[in-house]
């Protein structure tokens, strides 16, 4: 199995508001940057998208270390998801899981890989996280630029 290091981040200007996600994938001496944006979204959706797209980009099963600054993604994947699935994607209080479309997509994406989930404090100077943050903001900027051209 290939060893891949992934850094992800999401950003939102207003919550909800225009948002972006960014991810960096490192494999040996290879590096891939991914980013995207949506005109109306939330920070949590963008954090999820960063992890989803990064994992979906991997063509073969990999040994992954995925670093996020999102407690929402970290707790969801390591603590909450198993019970959500047992309850038919409902919370402990029997409410539908928020962002269930993305959680289900992430659930599918993680199945192929052996993933070590790592949390890092955001905006604390961690180089991988800072780069992912810059890509997330680029995702917002490029999406807004395209919107400006379309109108």
From Swiss-Prot:
It catalyses: Endonucleolytic cleavage to 5'-phosphomonoester. Mg(2+) 1 binds at residues 9, 47, 69. One of its GO terms (cellular component) is cytoplasm. One of its GO terms (molecular function) is nucleic acid binding. InterPro entries: RNase_H, RNaseH-like_sf, RNaseH_domain, RNaseH_sf, RNaseHI. SUPFAM superfamilies: Ribonuclease H-like. One of its GO terms (biological process) is DNA replication, removal of RNA primer. Its EC number is 3.1.26.4. Binds 1 Mg(2+) ion per subunit. May bind a second metal ion at a regulatory site, or after substrate binding. It comes from the Bacteria. Endonuclease that specifically degrades the RNA of RNA-DNA hybrids. Belongs to the RNase H family. Monomer. This is Ribonuclease H. It comes from Alcanivorax borkumensis (strain ATCC 700651 / DSM 11573 / NCIMB 13689 / SK2).
């Amino acid at each position: 199995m290939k060893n891949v290091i992934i850094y992800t981040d999401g950003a939102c200007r207003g919550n909800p508001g225009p948002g972006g996600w960014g991810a960096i994938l490192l494999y040996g001496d290879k590096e891939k940057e991914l980013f995207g944006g949506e005109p109306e979204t939330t920070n949590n959706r963008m954090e999820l998208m960063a992890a989803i797209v990064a994992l979906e980009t991997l063509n073969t099963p990999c040994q992954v270390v995925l670093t996020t600054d999102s407690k929402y993604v970290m707790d969801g994947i390591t603590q909450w998801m198993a019970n959500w699935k047992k309850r038919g994607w409902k919370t402990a209080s029997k409410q539908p899981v928020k962002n269930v479309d993305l959680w289900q997509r992430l659930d599918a994406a993680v199945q192929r890989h052996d993933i070590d989930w790592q949390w890092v404090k955001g905006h604390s100077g961690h180089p991988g996280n800072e780069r992912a943050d810059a890509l997330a903001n680029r995702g917002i900027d490029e999406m807004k630029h395209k919107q400006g051209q379309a109108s």
